[in-house]
């Protein structure tokens, strides 16, 4: 539900790494949406033409682009940390792409696909999901050896299994 206050629309919240952020929308004379993160507030500046049309889809798109950018940076960092931790085990490629009902998956060609929506969850879930997918590079199925490998590098993984 959106609440209108003067020139701002305040959404209840958006999540970044499990933390709630207030979203404030300000309509300005600009041609493209802009976002700024100020403490626990995500300021979204939208062109005034969207205020007249009442189009809130542009807000959703702006937030998706924000998640995409955060995901690009953070996933790359965690992928590199995981590669080092696993002594060079790495996918052939990885792709950041929205996939329904999943945070990530490993394809037969050893490409890992990661949903950018993962940045809404705690950062440890990102680490767990990436470790999980890296382990699929060595063990295709959830065998005993697969789970032993995960446990070796993340002994407390079970607390993230239900979320991921």
Predicted regions and their residues:
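Active-site-proximal or metal-binding-adjacent scaffold patches in catalytic folds
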Residues: 1-127, 137-164
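Walker B beta-strand of ABC/ABC-like P-loop ATPase nucleotide-binding domains
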Residues: 130
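Walker B catalytic acidic pair
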Residues: 133
